[in-house]
Amino acid sequence: MKKNTLSAILMTLFLFISCNNSGKGGDSASTNPADESAKGPNLTEISKKITDSNAFVLAVKEVETLVLSIDELAKKAIGQKIDNNNGLAALNNQNGSLLAGAYAISTLITEKLSKLKNLEELKTEIAKAKKCSEEFTNKLKSGHADLGKQDATDDHAKAAILKTHATTDKGAKEFKDLFESVEGLLKAAQVALTNSVKELTSPVVAESPKKP
């Protein structure tokens, strides 16, 4: 959902809430049973739900950006160095610094996931992403003998962070699981936000008058 669209929705909610809460002096509460028989959506509750859902989506997108950064490093930077002429040039089997960077990003991913608000409807997706993140970070750490040296080989680096590599025993399998779990979490969060917005258009429900 675009930021401008969400801002417009929240502004409209604010105006509706302000109008509903304003009165012309005295008791503004309706005493007409017909008024009480028609109930629309609770705008205050929906406004909070939309705001919370949007904040959650933005937080997950931050995590997604970090995951994608590791994916880009894996696809483009293994066995490479900065070159003045072509941008990147071959530097085989010198991947220690690159892997240290990937590990640092992985710990940040775990940290950000641990701070996510535990929304009840997304608790399964949140728990899965947290588990995958911890497993990926621990896998990199446990492989420090091969991954923690400056002359870490290209094959070892690919086995650690390239999710499409044939050998994935040093972390790439766990990274693929993390990648997919964060994708799933983001999609679920976006659906939750969309559903919150849809509540604004829910039809007014007319209740049957209560018998005296």
Curated annotation (Swiss-Prot):
InterPro entries assigned: Lipoprotein_OspC (IPR001800), OspC-like_sf (IPR036437)
Domain of life: Bacteria
KO phenotype (gene knockout): No change in ability to colonize the tick gut, greatly decreased migration to the tick salivary gland during feeding, about 800-fold reduction in transmission to mice. No longer binds host I.scapularis Salp15 protein (strain ATCC 53899 / 297).
Gene3D superfamilies: Lipoprotein, type 6
One Pfam entry name: Lipoprotein_6
Endpoints of the signal sequence: 1-18
Lipid-substituted positions (N-palmitoyl cysteine): C19
Residues linked to a lipid group, S-diacylglycerol cysteine type: C19
Membrane topology: Lipid-anchor
Keyword Protease listed: no
Swiss-Prot/TrEMBL keywords: Cell outer membrane, Lipoprotein, Membrane, Palmitate, Plasmid, Signal, Virulence
Location of the protein in the cell: Cell outer membrane; Cell surface
GO CC terms, sorted: cell outer membrane; cell surface
Induction context: Poorly expressed in vitro in strain N40, expressed for a short time following mouse infection, then it disappears (at protein level).
Misc: The causative agent of Lyme disease, the bacteria has an enzootic lifestyle. Larval ticks are infected with bacteria during feeding on infected hosts (mostly mammals) which retain the bacteria during subsequent developmental stages. It is transmitted to the next host when it is bitten by ticks. During tick feeding (which can last for several days), bacterial migrate from the tick midgut to the salivary gland where they are transmitted to the host. This gene is encoded on a 26 kb circular plasmid (cp26) in strains B31, N40 and B.afzelii strain PKo; it is probably encoded on cp26 in the other strains given here.
Self-association and partners: Homodimer. Binds to tick salivary glands; antibodies against this protein cause a decrease in Borrelia movement to the tick salivary glands during host feeding. Interacts with host Ixodes scapularis salivary protein 15 (Salp15). Interacts with host I.ricinus salivary protein Iric-1. Binds human (host) plasminogen.
Function (record text): Major immunodominant protein in mammalian hosts. Required for initial stages of mammalian infection. Exploits its interaction with Ixodes scapularis salivary protein 15 (Salp15) or its paralog I.ricinus Iric-1 to increase mammalian host infection. Binding of bacteria to Salp15 or Iric-1 protects them from antibody-mediated destruction in vitro, due to interaction with this protein. Preincubation with Salp15 or Iric-1 allows bacteria to infect mice that had already cleared a B.burgdorferi infection, showing it is important in bacterial colonization and dissemination.
Official protein name in the record: Outer surface protein C
Organism: Borreliella burgdorferi (Lyme disease spirochete)
Gene: ospC
